[in-house]
């Protein structure tokens, strides 16, 4: 080969001109031959190995499909999955449009394979707002528990109110005194009942007219406790039921007890003020505000009015109207006595 010859050192000085020309003419050919050899060393496009991952996987599965018939169904589903999720993404595409296209692809895949949801990794695709709100409520179970407990408490409170009202409406043959003692016990017994319908019952409040209230007040002033016969007669007279009369008397007795307790505190306060700001009888003067009226016959009205609270009322009046005027009157009296002496 000429390449072996060219590898030897060439001495151009010993050559003739003709030989030089021949050697010079051979040099470009050698370069061309080297370029051809380099091209032969490079792999041509025809000799490149062409392969696809899906084809390789199919070639690997071919012997298994021939051996087992059950694997054919699995291969078919795998092929569907491989072809279904092919998504051609264009880098120049708008991100919003790409997301919409991806969502549409997932929806199509879910419809083809009869899937409940398109993809478990994207649970927000294709879900209505009602389900999202349901998931939101499920994420906060404490709120639901608290609301349920609040409703149960309201129902229990309403049930207790209704039961106390029902307990007050017992048999009309019993006396009112026994009914007052059995109010708490009857409500406790009925609170243990397991019927939820009784707890939800609501009693309508009875509205009494003025004439009915006045008659009931007059009867209450005469008698605090009524027998069954008296209660039935009064109910027939006022066009009310015996239960309504009985409940009214119970409420009125409770109100009277509360008023008595408040009156006791007021009386004790008045007595305390009377003891602190009391004036001796020898130095006490008659005030025009506190003068006791007399009749035409000269009879003092104090003797006609029997009230054990005269001293306390006088002391309270002194406290309310102030001690400035009383002190001034005492000073005048002292100066008058000094002049008389």
Curated annotation (Swiss-Prot):
**A matching Pfam family:** Homeodomain
The listed locations are: Nucleus
Q: Which intervals carry biased composition (Polar residues)?
A: 64-78
Kindly list any coiled-coil regions of this protein: none
Q: Which GO terms describe its cellular component?
A: nucleus
The cross-references to PANTHER family, in alphabetical order and at most eight, read: HOMEOBOX PROTEIN HMX
| Family membership | Belongs to the HMX homeobox family.
Report the protein name in the record.
Homeobox protein mls-2
Native species of this protein?
Caenorhabditis elegans
């Amino acid at each position: 080969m000429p390449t072996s010859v060219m590898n030897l050192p060439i001495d151009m000085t010993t050559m003739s001109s003709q030989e030089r020309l021949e050697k010079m003419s051979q040099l470009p050919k050698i370069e061309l031959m080297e370029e051809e050899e380099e091209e032969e060393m490079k792999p041509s496009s025809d000799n490149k190995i062409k392969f696809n991952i899906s084809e390789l996987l199919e070639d690997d599965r071919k012997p298994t499909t021939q051996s087992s018939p059950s694997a054919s169904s699995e291969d078919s589903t795998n092929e569907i999955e491989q072809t279904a999720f092919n998504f051609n993404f264009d880098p120049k595409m708008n991100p919003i449009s790409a997301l919409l296209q991806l969502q549409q692809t997932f929806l199509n895949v879910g419809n083809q394979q009869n899937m409940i949801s398109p993809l478990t990794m994207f649970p927000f695709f294709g879900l209505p707002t009602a389900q999202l709100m349901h998931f939101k409520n499920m994420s906060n179970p404490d709120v639901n528990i608290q609301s349920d407990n609040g409703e149960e408490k309201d129902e229990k409170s309403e049930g207790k109110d209704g039961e106390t009202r029902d307990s007050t409406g017992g048999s009309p043959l019993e006396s009112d005194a026994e009914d007052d003692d059995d109010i708490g016990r009857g409500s406790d017994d009925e609170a243990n009942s397991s019927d939820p319908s009784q707890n939800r019952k609501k009693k309508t409040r009875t509205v009494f007219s003025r004439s009915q209230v006045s008659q009931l007040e007059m009867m209450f002033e005469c008698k605090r406790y009524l027998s069954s016969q008296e209660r039935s007669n009064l109910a027939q007279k006022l066009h009310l039921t015996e239960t309504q009369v009985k409940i009214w008397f119970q409420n009125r007795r409770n109100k009277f007890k509360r008023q008595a307790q408040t009156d006791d505190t007021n009386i004790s306060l008045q007595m305390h003020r009377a003891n602190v700001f009391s004036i001796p009888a020898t130095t006490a003067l008659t005030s025009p505000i506190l003068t006791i009226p007399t009749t035409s016959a000269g009879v003092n009205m104090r003797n006609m009015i029997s009230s054990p609270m005269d001293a306390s009322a006088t002391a309270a009046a002194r406290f309310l109207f102030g001690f400035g005027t009383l002190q001034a009157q005492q000073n005048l009296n002292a100066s008058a006595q000094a002049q008389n002496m």
